[in-house]
């Protein structure tokens, strides 16, 4: 699977990637491969992802690519890898809220926002780590271990920035769903 270069992920914003996908200058599979490569490289240090859905995401990216080639365009998120905060239900995929008692919880249906992302053609790449049950601001209290700050490892990632800095800003993904 050909991957977008990590350098391109570092400098190109979501609008640029979207336009390149829409005009078929870049494929959703290439973008996904670049994101998965980045996750593999840096997630062991950052612990931003609880679950990575490589196989499912590849199937979604391949389907998005086929749709785009036939002229079906769902909108600006079509083919874009999106991470989901582990607080939001994803059908058939563990949703734990980073809480030990929910470690094996698998919902039967998607949260409304997740369903809307899928309808828009977004590629769900994985579930991101968070403070247990969303009850704190540090990101240190997760059943899956603390989330680390990509810019300054000696500092906490902190609250909302947990997901934003550790997945989107370090360019694991181009977009993140969660508050």
Across the structure, where does each feature detected by a protein language model lie?
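Glycine-rich, aromatic-flanked loop segments that form ligand/cofactor-binding clefts
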Residues: 65-88, 122, 127-129
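Enzymes and membrane/adaptor proteins characterized by extended Gly/Ser/Thr/Asp/Glu-rich
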Residues: 14, 76-113, 140
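Generic hydrophobic alpha-helical segments
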Residues: 17-21, 61-64, 164
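Short glycine/serine-rich loop segments
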Residues: 109-179
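An N-terminal boundary/leader segment
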Residues: 1-56
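Flexible, acidic active-site loops/lids enriched in D/E/S/T/G that coordinate Mg2+ and/or position polar
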Residues: 54-77, 103, 107, 117, ...
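Conserved hydrophobic residue
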Residues: 26-27, 73, 173
């Amino acid at each position: 699977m050909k991957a977008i270069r990590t350098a391109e992920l570092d400098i190109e914003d979501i609008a640029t990637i979207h336009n390149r996908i829409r005009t078929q200058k870049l494929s959703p599979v290439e973008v996904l491969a670049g994101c998965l490569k980045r996750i593999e490289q840096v997630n062991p240090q950052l612990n931003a992802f609880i679950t990575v859905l490589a196989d499912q995401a590849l199937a979604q990216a391949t389907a998005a690519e086929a749709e785009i080639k036939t002229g079906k365009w769902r909108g600006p998120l079509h083919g874009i890898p999106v991470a989901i905060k582990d607080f939001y239900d994803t059908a058939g995929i563990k949703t734990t809220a980073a809480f030990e008692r929910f470690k094996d919880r698998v919902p039967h249906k998607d949260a409304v926002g997740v369903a809307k992302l899928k309808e828009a053609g977004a590629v769900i790449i994985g579930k991101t780590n968070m403070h247990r049950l969303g009850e704190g601001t540090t990101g240190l209290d997760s059943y899956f271990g603390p989330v680390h700050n990509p810019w300054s490892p000696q500092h906490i990632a902190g609250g909302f920035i947990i997901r934003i800095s550790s997945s989107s800003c370090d360019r694991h993904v181009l977009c993140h769903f969660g508050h």
